[in-house]
Amino acid sequence: MGYRFQPSSRHFVGTVEQKHRELLHNQIQNVYHLFDVSVSRMITRRWTVNASLPVFLAYRNQLYVPRGEFRVRSIGDVTVGGRAWIFRPPTESGANIGLGLNLKLPTGKYNALGVATDRNGNVIVATADQSIQAGDGGTGFSVDVQAYRPFYGRTMLYFSGTYLFNPRNTNGVSTFRTRRGEQVMSVADQYLARGGVSRALPKFRHITVTFGGRIEGVPVRDLIGRSDGFRRPGYAISLDPGFMVAYKGSVFSCNVPFAVERNRRRSVTDIANGTHGDAAFADYALILGFSRSF
């Protein structure tokens, strides 16, 4: 199981921070809590099947019309799939590469609503912003890779990467936006890659420290299908320190990636309209994990 906490309030256009938003007290604040319950079963030493159920809680204070505080509580998009190691573990070199394929089902709420006020101060029911929806409304699939190899002594090199393909173009959910092409939400691809080094502490044999980097984001254009509708493409590059504690079949992990570069790229609709929208990015995230082998 896993948990991710992430607050975001610093706005960027491209890589330029919009510092005036904070000075004018009109920056948008998003707060995310993501719980993930997963189960996996080893079929053979090389093959594993898995399933994951995320639970999503989010808050957003929206300071423009429709103005209000939005809260979303929902399960997220369920994934089921499998993974195979290229070499049968354990390998003589201590290194291996794993490939995974997962199906993403549109089980998360992607049309959550909230109470807000319009330009005239009237109380209305409005669609929550795309950034705090628990799902995207699309059936997709992801491919992932994991790799590790011994480097020196107790030091290990590691890498993992995931790309989520979302072939659906838009999900039909109306936004509050009037700019051409942004009236409905886009169903966007997503990606994540991280890598670094880990080292077991000699005096604390159950503890391993890790340090690396990660990049995660949303592309301007999907690899499969069209990329119409409203989306906020871009990426964040972070340094990613952490540690793991392993004891008698249980593993606890903690990572606190903190951003060193944020880039809100121009979307397809931005390019068509000659504009460049902004996006709020997080300074850091707290990522916890716990697993138990039976």
Question: Which functions belong to the PLM regions below?
Answer:
Residues 3-9, 55-59, 86, 103-109, ...:
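Transmembrane beta-strands of outer-membrane beta-barrel pores
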Residues 33-37, 76-82, 97, 139-145, ...:
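Hydrophobic, lipid-facing positions within transmembrane beta-strands of outer-membrane proteins
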Residues 12-22, 168-294:
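Outer membrane beta-barrel transmembrane domains
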Residues 23-85:
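Long, hydrophobic/aromatic-enriched structural stretches that serve as scaffold segments
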Residues 57-186:
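Outer-membrane pore/translocation modules
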Residues 8-10, 46, 87-97, 112, ...:
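Short loop/turn motifs that connect adjacent beta-strands in outer-membrane beta-barrel proteins
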Residues 5-34, 131:
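Surface-exposed strand-loop-strand hairpins of Gram-negative outer-membrane beta-barrel proteins
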Residues 1, 49-51, 80, 95-101, ...:
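Transmembrane beta-strands of outer-membrane beta-barrel proteins
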